[in-house]
Amino acid sequence: MQKKYVVALDQGTTSSRAIVFDHDANIVSVSQREFTQLYPNPGWVEHDPMEIWASQSSVLVEVLARAGIHSDEVAAIGITNQRETTVIWEKATGKPIYNAIVWQCRRSSEICEQLKAQGLEEYVRENTGLLLDPYFSGTKIKWILDNVPNARAQAERGELLFGTIDTWLVWKLTEGKVHVTDPTNAARTMLFNIHSLTWDNKLLEALDIPLSLLPEVKPSCSVYGTTRIAGEGSEIQVAGMAGDQQAALFGQLCVEPGMAKNTYGTGCFLLMNTGTKAVRSNHGLLTTVAVGPKGEVNYALEGSVFMGGATIQWLRDELGLIRDASDTEYFASKVADTNGVYLVPAFVGLGAPYWDPNARGALFGLTRGANRNHIIRAALESIAYQSKDLLDAMTKDSGVSLKRLKVDGGAVANDFLMQFQADITDVEVLRPSVCETTALGAAFLAGLAVGFWESVIELEHKACIDKHFIPNIDAETRVRLYAGWQDAVARTRA
């Protein structure tokens, strides 16, 4: 039977999804299932790994059945996933010894402080590209080994396996035959040397993690094994894998140095490809691994904003200023400007490039003439200002001035926000026709690995742009508006 499709498994923080793409990179079928969020203690976040697998395997069956697609027609399955989330399971039984500790979980803060006391902060920064933070997998692994009865003894005997979610899914898909990850996910563990592209023995020793626990690291664009859908039909190749933000970067075909994408979700994730050069940031950004045009290792600068779409949720849920997120475009467009109002949405502190956990949200410039429309417009503009903060930091670190910014995520449907983003950054903003770029990136990697597509050049003909947003304000206005934002941020941090 002719191979007509590639399936992307998109395992996210709140739901598991499966998306079928045809040879023209069109979406044919989508299936999605949410799963349980567990909060056993303040600041702790967990998932049940078996529920993740159940939700992901069921949507894989559903997505094909819904479109009447036979498994024989599927060329490959690609994987993209929430990064950093940590699973440890028994090699013999495949049974997790503890719930998955989610990237948001802060329980290993004390372990991070111990590593800082040992003087490892600079070593971590230099060799992994990351900050010493509980966000990343390394300290989560140590917490499980230290706190689950008998776990450390089992690990020392080589009876346990660790994986981020990509590794866990491949293990389950291949029925325990393959224990593997890719460089983009390995680079988020805080255990991976991004220069030698190997596990870092000094960090493993510092955290007392046996090497036998860790998966083999294979290229993001390669075949890892085979699977059968629900144990039936012919074998399908499991091929192509990347963490969610790197998958989106590849899905946007940002495969050359200086190309960048911004994902507008709950927060914002801005990544810039820096090619074969790992650029160290002096402005609060992370240095991480990306995927090059032939599936090889490239590097990227990454910055994250905590409050993107979440700011709009606040307008809706806490202030009651809007009924739906899409209302913001209408209200923001009813006024010519914010009337001097700035919202700094530092509800949980400020992310890159400030990294100020003590900052708190504030509205500035309120006068008797300020109304609902001005506040809504200021909220939308705050997302663009924060993204400009990241973009300026990337320009300083990389020495590359961006000319075009590719965008994806839920908020890109808002034309007002996209136009203001172009205006305030003086950069052309490109919105793709297919905004499912994370899943598309996984599909591209899988399809390239098995020859479903020949090259990135072929893919460029399939990646259509829905709309170009051209900068439309003068330099003087841009400087004045951004100076107002910088002043508001400074006051928030005072």
Curated annotation (Swiss-Prot):
It comes from Shewanella baltica (strain OS185). It catalyses: glycerol + ATP = sn-glycerol 3-phosphate + ADP + H(+). Keywords: ATP-binding, Glycerol metabolism, Kinase, Nucleotide-binding, Transferase. Glycerol binds at residues 83-84, 135, 244-245. One of its GO terms (molecular function) is glycerol kinase activity. GO terms for cellular component: cytosol. ADP binds at residues 13, 17, 266, 309, 410, 414. Pfam families: FGGY_C, FGGY_N. CDD domains: FGGY_EcGK_like (cd07786). The gene is glpK. This is Glycerol kinase. Pathway: Polyol metabolism; glycerol degradation via glycerol kinase pathway; sn-glycerol 3-phosphate from glycerol: step 1/1. InterPro entries: ATPase_NBD, Carb_kinase_FGGY, Carb_kinase_FGGY_CS, FGGY_C, FGGY_N, Glycerol_kin. ATP binds at residues 13-15, 266, 309, 313, 410. Key enzyme in the regulation of glycerol uptake and metabolism. Catalyzes the phosphorylation of glycerol to yield sn-glycerol 3-phosphate. Inhibited by fructose 1,6-bisphosphate (FBP). Its EC number is 2.7.1.30. The lineage of its organism: Bacteria, Pseudomonadati, Pseudomonadota, Gammaproteobacteria, Alteromonadales. One of its GO terms (biological process) is glycerol catabolic process. Sn-glycerol 3-phosphate binds at residues 13, 83-84, 135, 244. Belongs to the FGGY kinase family.
